[in-house]
Amino acid sequence: AGFKAGVKDYKLTYYTPDYETKDTDILAAFRVTPQPGVPPEEAGAAVAAESSTGTWTTVWTDGLTSLDRYKGRCYHIETVVGEENQYIAYVAYPLDLFEEGSVTNMFTSIVGNVFGFKALRALRLEDLRIPPSYSKTFQGPPHGIQVERDKLNKYGRPLLGCTIKPKLGLSAKNYGRAVYECLRGGLDFTKDDENVNSQPFMRWRDRFLFCTEAIYKAQTETGEIKGHYLNATAGTCEEMMKRAIFARELGVPIIMHDYLTGGFTANTSLAHYCRDNGLLLHIHRAMHAVIDRQKNHGMHFRVLAKALRMSGGDHIHGGTVVGKLEGEREMTLGFVDLLRDDFIEKDRSRGIFFTQDWVSMPGVIPVASGGIHVWHMPALTEIFGDDSVLQFGGGTLGHPWGNAPGAVANRVALEACVQARNEGRDLAREGNEIIREASKWSPELAAACEVWKEIKFDF
C-alpha cells in the first residue's frame, strides 16, 4: 500500500491524552500561547511534533521507522489561571531521541526550531523532568557541595564572596591588590567579573599571576583557605582550556566560566577537566535574562539551572530575593532546591512542575549576588541557609574606609547572624537588632551600617 501524502493535523498523531508516561521519558512543561483560532490541542501537539520527529507534511520515509517508538507526545493540557489564551502543554519525549551526556543535543531538540513556529504566538519552557536513566549519562558538577567544604575546610556557614569592581579598566597589579585586601579582610572568595576575559588593559595571564599572589599572601596571613574565581571564558575552547590548565599549574582552588555565552559544549568539557584536576568551577549566568525574563516566551531559569547541574558547575548565580535583580522568593527557592538537593517534590506554588530525582548527582551551591549589603545579611542567611555563597561587590568595595574594612564588615555581620541563628533567635524578626548589636564592637560594621542604612532597590 502506498503512503498517504499531504498535510494532516498534528493532533491526530501527537496529541495522546491517554498516554501513560514512562520512567525513562524526559517530560517537559511548555507555556503555550496559540495564535487566534488555533485550538490548544493542535498547538500542544505541534510543539511535541516539531521538537521530536515531526515535519510539516507526511513524508515517505516515515514508513521506514516506528513513529510510535520515537515521537514526542503531548499527553496533557491545562489552562493557565488568570491568563487569557495561555495553556500548559505537557510533552513526553522517549529517551532514545537524545544523545547521552549532551545538554547541547537535549536543548537543540526541545527548544530548537519549535520556538519560531508560526502557529504559536509565544512559547516558554517552564520545567523539565530529567529521568535518572538520562541524568546518569552526565558527570554533573566537578565536585559538589560536600567536597567543596572539605577542600576549603569551611563548615556551618554560608561562604562570602566579592566581585572586583570597577569591572573593566583596572590593571592586573591594582586588580590583584583589591583581591588581596578583600581576602585579607575576611572573605572566602573574590571574583572576576563575567566580562573580564583578556582585554587590552589586563591580559588574562597577568591577572592570573597577580591574583594568585594575592591568594597565597592572604592565606598565609589569615590561616584560612582563600580563592579567586579566575574567569577562563575565552573565544575558543582551546584558549579556554589553556587558561584552565595555567590556573591548575598555579595551584589555585577555583576557576570560573560564563556557561551561556561560552556554550554548553565548552562548559561540559571544562567541568570534566575540573573534576580530573581538582579545580572547583564557579558558573556565571550572563545572558540568562535574554532567555528567561519574558513570562510567556523563552525558558524559565529553573530549566537553565537543571541543565547546568547536568553539564557541570560547583557554584551558580541564582538571584538574591532581596537585592537589585529580579527574583520572586518562592520561585527562587524552588530552583535553589533543584540545584542543591537530591530529591525535589513537585510543588506548583514554587514553580516545580515535576518531581525531580537526581539520584546521587552532586549538588551546586547557589550564589546570591547583586545589590546586597550588610543589612541584608540576616535575610540572606535565613533564605539561603549554609550551602550558599553570598556575594557583595559594591557592598564590600563601597565601604567608606576601603576594601579590607568592607570585607571585615561583611564577615562580622555573617558570623553574628550565624551565631544568633544557632542560639535560636529569629533572623526574620530580629535581623536589624542582631546587626546593630554586632556593630557596637565592630567599627567597620558600624561604618557600613551607616552608609547603607536606607538603600533598598524597590520599584
Swiss-Prot record:
Main location: plastid
Post-translational note: The disulfide bond which can form in the large chain dimeric partners within the hexadecamer appears to be associated with oxidative stress and protein turnover.
Site keyed Transition state stabilizer: positions: 324
Cofactor(s) the protein requires to work: Mg(2+)
EC main group: lyase
Keyword rRNA-binding applies: no
Sites of N6-carboxylysine modification: 191
Subcellular location: Plastid, Chloroplast
Assigned keywords, A-Z: Calvin cycle, Carbon dioxide fixation, Chloroplast, Disulfide bond, Lyase, Magnesium, Metal-binding, Methylation, Monooxygenase, Oxidoreductase, Photorespiration, Photosynthesis, Plastid
SUPFAM superfamilies: RuBisCo, C-terminal domain, RuBisCO, large subunit, small (N-terminal) domain
Cofactor binding annotation: Binds 1 Mg(2+) ion per subunit.
One GO CC term on file: chloroplast
GO molecular function: magnesium ion binding; monooxygenase activity; ribulose-bisphosphate carboxylase activity
Residues noted as binding Mg(2+) in the record, renumbered to the chain: 191, 193-194
Catalytic-site annotation from UniProt: 165, 284
An individual GO BP term: reductive pentose-phosphate cycle
Location of N6,N6,N6-trimethyllysine modifications: 4
Top-level lineage group: Eukaryota
Subunit structure, as described in the record: Heterohexadecamer of 8 large chains and 8 small chains; disulfide-linked. The disulfide link is formed within the large subunit homodimers.
Additional observations: The basic functional RuBisCO is composed of a large chain homodimer in a 'head-to-tail' conformation. In form I RuBisCO this homodimer is arranged in a barrel-like tetramer with the small subunits forming a tetrameric 'cap' on each end of the 'barrel'.
Protein name according to UniProt: Ribulose bisphosphate carboxylase large chain
Organism name: Nypa fruticans (Nypa palm)
Gene behind this protein: rbcL
